[in-house]
Amino acid sequence: MSVIESIRGVLWARRHRPDQVAIVMGASHERFAPQELLRQAVLAEEAGFDAVACSDHLTPWWVPGGLAPAHCGNAWVWLGAASQATGAIGLGTGVTGVIHRYNPVVVAQQVATLEALAPGRTFLGVGSSEAMNEVPAGMRWPDTAEQLQRTAEALEIIVRLLDGETVDFRGVYFTTTGARLYDRPARRPPVIVSAFHEQIAEVAGQLADGLWTLGSPTIAPKVIAAYRRGAEKAGREPGEIWLQALAATGADDDEALAGSREWKPALVQELYTHDIHSTGDIQAKGEDVSDGQFTRANLVSADPGSHVAKLRLLSELGATGIVVVNASGADPEGLIRLYGRDVLPRLREG
């Protein structure tokens, strides 16, 4: 079985038609405590989501105790618990940074272990992280060129280890000596790369099994095209294309917006590339995002029809999977129930 077939085995298990788009719930460690997120994962499986992708952050997007509660449980410890609390839903990170804080050998070991605990259900989302997650851990935040090279080196190591190689690697930033996975699962977890810019998207096409980017009509087409170019250059079939948006609901649209405003910094591109790492500075950057910009870019509405319409627009951009990040602070479990009752069935009926 190819890696692409293996990921489709995870995400297409509930498909009524093979062309349906996978809907993945984003579980937000920054906003919800670990036990609460476990409850959300169980509810997501019951509601009919195809997978759960949990964030992997050390620092939240806002000042603790300000706009919203702030948490940041460890993604990999939580995924181990989620693998035992759920039975069939896909599980993985959305996404793990691989430039500093995590060594790529350890990342490969972590996802291989998760696959052993949840056979046939796992995937690995990786990216270059943000300064907020690296600088507090004592790491130097690199410029964009170094971020790109670090990510490419880490990605090569991870993929080779998951493919069963013993890896001797001498890169500019990473080195391995006889590294291997001693508990390598029978099925190789697919690796999906987060990319907001064309250069890393092209690397993803050359080395990885899928692309993960923002569901923006101005960003997604260029990034997707670069990903496909990279795959073509490497003589590979393009894999999965996941588009991401935040989602929130409430008693009405005003409550949906009020319960998700803390997420505005996630729309600021500068936070993904520049050394901005304090929660105060991060939150301040989000203040430049208007309510209108925030709601247009995301799924923020009490009306399930609005969610369905926007998800269909994302599908038309070329998505094979859509990551719906649960940003519904007013009623996170209500968002999951809304999707299970009124959104997912309408999407899947055509």
Regions found by a protein language model. Name each.
Residues 1-350:
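Active-site-adjacent structural elements that line small-molecule/cofactor binding pockets in enzymes
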